């Protein structure tokens, strides 16, 4: 995440009436374990430890379970694994869920890699597509 820019990212969504309804990280660090083996098993299923297919499928389930209307993806330049397959995974999620996808760049280790203007433009475009999809459905 772009921790130094949480105000900018949350304002960009709030000002457009967009709610963030799910996150992939919620279950990554919120688990209980009693033994070291249980801890290891839990950590082997966090987002950064699984392959593209499992990552995609977890996200598709989250999108469908929460009736997601659009996907906003942060490409974290400090996380090489995710930066490498994030675009393909996002494309597959968009197709499987029939939702628009927008991505923006950032870097948890170097905040200079975040552009508020890029973020705002991407969120604006995503919002326009989501609104057009709603209008086409008569909502």
What are these model-predicted stretches?
Residues 1-60, 64:
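Redox- and metal-dependent alpha/beta enzyme cores, enriched for Fe-S-associated oxidoreductases
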Residues 22-25, 75-77, 105-108:
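Active-site proximal loops enriched in glycine and acidic residues that flank catalytic Cys/His/Asp
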Residues 50-53, 79-83, 110-113:
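Acidic-and-aromatic substrate-binding clefts and catalytic sites of carbohydrate-active enzymes
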Residues 56-97, 102:
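C-terminal hydrophobic structural anchor segments
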Residues 87-139:
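Peripheral docking tails and interdomain loops at the edges
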